[in-house]
């Protein structure tokens, strides 16, 4: 797996079907990527990828995360990241959302503190597993 460098990472520009709801979602079939990996990139959105099948290794700002089937990874806005399948036929469901959308939504309902963990750049990433009982502190 390559060493992540912000100098070599490409900014991924995502498009939205509806500008009022800036969300993109797609299914990643890792076998369709060269060598089963998606190269270093970053974007303004935060990302949540759920492993539907198989296992994958993620590198986020140089830190390694292992994500297994049934688990997910949260990646903060502007974090440089890449992913590589660790098993054949690995599939992930991916959702990316502009943090400003959540900030605006929660401001309207006076719940800004709930948006803070998803709109900040720290933590850069964390893995969510079915066994994990605790939530993220607000």
Question: Over which residues does each language-model region extend?
Answer:
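Generic protein-terminus/edge-of-domain signal
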Residues: 1-66, 72, 112, 123
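A hydrophobic/aromatic-rich effector-binding and dimerization subdomain
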Residues: 2-24, 80-138
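Tight coil/turn sites that cap or link beta-strands
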Residues: 33-34, 69-70, 78, 98-100
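Exposed loop/turn and edge beta-strand positions of beta-sandwich/beta-sheet ligand-binding modules
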Residues: 42-44, 77, 91
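A short, compositionally biased micro-patch
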Residues: 51-53, 76, 86
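Short amphipathic alpha-helical leader/targeting segments
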Residues: 68-69, 84
């Amino acid at each position: 797996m390559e060493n992540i460098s912000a100098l070599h990472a490409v900014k991924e520009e995502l498009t939205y079907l509806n500008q009022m709801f800036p969300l993109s979602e797609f299914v990643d079939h890792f076998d369709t990527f060269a060598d089963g990996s998606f190269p270093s990139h970053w974007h303004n959105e935060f990302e949540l990828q759920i492993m539907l099948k198989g296992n994958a290794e993620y590198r986020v700002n140089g830190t390694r995360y292992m994500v297994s089937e049934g688990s997910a990874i949260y990646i903060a806005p502007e974090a440089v990241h890449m992913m590589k399948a660790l098993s054949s036929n690995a599939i992930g469901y991916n959702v990316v959302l502009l943090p400003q959308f959540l900030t605006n939504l929660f401001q309207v309902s006076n719940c800004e503190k709930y948006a803070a963990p998803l709109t900040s750049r720290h933590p850069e990433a964390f893995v969510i597993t079915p066994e994990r009982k605790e939530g993220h502190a607000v």
